[in-house]
Amino acid sequence: MNIRRKLGQNFLNSKSIAKFIVDSAKISKNDIVYEIGIGKGILTPFLCEESKKVISVEKDHQLYEETLAKFSKIKNLKIIYGDGFKQYEKFDIFVSNLPYSESKKAIQWMLMNKFTYGIVMVQYDFAKKLLAEKQERKAVSVLAQSGFEMKILKKIGKKNFTPNPKIDSAIMSFLRKDTFSKELIQSVNLMFSFRRKKLQNIGKKLGIEIESNQRLEAMNNNEIIKFAKKIRKI
């Protein structure tokens, strides 16, 4: 099975939306742009026009070969075959239309990498989850809100993809506020497996003495991050 289909990838087919994504990234001629999932390459030429260099990573070998041949004359483009989350490239701006199945993984990866700004296409419902308030928050909501200033820039309908997905998408911006370690991310995820419990009871589950009857879901993001650091002694 094609990797992209297995991952739940639908290819953007609108050049006007591709241009909107690139324009929203606020790229300068001094910027190095990192793109995970080159796909059919609809974003890539626009990214190359605006930036110093574009590094695009594709894990589907057929798509990698196709885009390598298609964009062979673009001087400031480096195309890598492999997993974009496992490369060690330095960059300023992250731009991607990711498979929806990798959205949570992508957010956690973004939190650990020191770039300035990102524009990412995600499932619309996932975008709302990232921006959720207290009672509706998940671990990924707290982490994303603590690490980035986020906005939904545009809702994108199904007809703008091939094949048409069953759900709508959203273009989101991510302005860096903080960078988190893998250990801190794991700590927040662990805490949210007990999200309905009081801190005192969470402490017992984790073998830590905590004198507080406050519930995790009642805490603000800063309090949760501070508590997560205490658990892991980060």
Language-model features and meaning:
Residues 1-190, 222, 226-234:
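Catalytic cores of RNA-modifying enzymes
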Residues 166, 194-196, 201-234:
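Conserved Class I S-adenosyl-L-methionine
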